[in-house]
Amino acid sequence: MDSIKGTDEKYLTVSELNWYVKQKFDRDPYLRQIFLQGELSNFRFRRGGHQYFSLKDDKSKINVVMFRGDFDKVKFEPEEGMKVYVTGRLSTYEAQGSYQFYAKSMEPAGLGALYERFRQLQEKLAKEGLFAQEHKRPLPLFPDKIAVVTSASGAVIHDIMVTANRRFSHAEIDLFPAQVQGESAAGSLVSAMQQIQARADEYDVLIIGRGGGSLEDLWPFNEEEVVRQVYAMKMPVISSVGHETDTTLCDLAADCRAATPTAAAEMATPALPLVLAEIGQLQTRLLTDIRAVIQVRAQALAQLENSFIMKEPQRLYEQKMQQVDQLSQQLSRMMEVIVKDQGQKLSLLTQRLQHQAPDRRIKQLKQENSYLAKSLEMGIKRILEQKQAACRQAVQQLDDYSPLKTLARGYSYTTDASGNVVKSVQQLVPGDQVRLHLKDGQAIGRIEEIKEEKND
């Protein structure tokens, strides 16, 4: 009381009294660390600030302050009416002369606290899509290497290796040992998965798990950092945590959940004898299908060999051969006309020469005659060459128009179900059966869609 000074020896100011009471509270060793339980009341979350609420039981209530730095460490979302454990100190607020509890930590009360943390984290991660079905990846059919994260001393790794070797001995099993229980288990599990992630290209699938236990024993597999690491793995993950009735957040984030380690190994590996039997069945079906295709193609080839075109191919050339004969006859007649015309000209020149008789004229006419003779010869030769070229072109066209040669160049022609040649899309409707004639056989198909193209 030495520091208390009032305007009168007998009277204290309000501030002096509140200060004195605060000193009493702050110096009391029993009030410096108090473990308190109660029900949250008047709780309204203040984002980014200090939290002010009350704790109550059936008979009493106390005001509580939790500063931002301490509240940020709380691992669950407090809700109105929730029973909690808090630790802190008791002191007064001088400005109002009231005492209140200053909370340093808070957690849900009892075993229900873990269930509440589980529920809240499950809801949070589900909203982020970590458990969404569209993110689940299929397991590889034939894994070369399988990574396993579990205890090195438990029965889990033994069951996995025995089952995998029995079903698919080709697969290599690599153990990444980790603690699966206790306060440091979550960090150990994450560290093991990060080692696998660094070598992700080596492993086809990951199995993570442990044997059965209580909720507290299995809790590391519900920690947020473990669940997020499972979701982030680059290879498919099989989770096998606890018994079949146990469900952890790790199970929900994994691509597949197995009830037991043995079931996890069965998911990760194929049953080799069954696979070999299925391959044998597929081989038999494939051979049957191949034989059927060969038989159909052989029948088509036989039909082609017995067709009109193959038996009498010369009939394809008959009309073209007649055209060649006609062109040859026309060429001969033209040659006769040209020769006759030039002969008449020569006769006229000769007659004129006989009438004129002078040597100079005769010489000139001889030169003209020589020139005309050469011109005639060159003209005849040129006409012959042109007609011969036309004849060769006609023969070549005749050969080009051969259906066999057209088919040999990769073309085909199409007939409908009645055997009529299809020349326009207007002859067809979707669903019609058509036959494609190729150089080495026929193919039967069905019209799916018709697209008409207009040529300008």
Curated annotation (Swiss-Prot):
Its EC number is 3.1.11.6. GO terms for cellular component: cytoplasm; exodeoxyribonuclease VII complex. Keywords: Cytoplasm, Exonuclease, Hydrolase, Nuclease. It comes from the Bacteria. InterPro entries: Exonuc_VII_L, Exonuc_VII_lsu_C, OB-fold_nuc-bd_dom. It catalyses: Exonucleolytic cleavage in either 5'- to 3'- or 3'- to 5'-direction to yield nucleoside 5'-phosphates. It is found in: Cytoplasm. One of its GO terms (biological process) is DNA catabolic process. CDD domains: ExoVII_LU_OBF. It is an enzyme of class 3 (hydrolase). One of its GO terms (molecular function) is nucleic acid binding. HAMAP family: Exonuc_7_L. Belongs to the XseA family. Bidirectionally degrades single-stranded DNA into large acid-insoluble oligonucleotides, which are then degraded further into small acid-soluble oligonucleotides. NCBIfam families: xseA. Heterooligomer composed of large and small subunits. This is Exodeoxyribonuclease 7 large subunit. The gene is xseA.
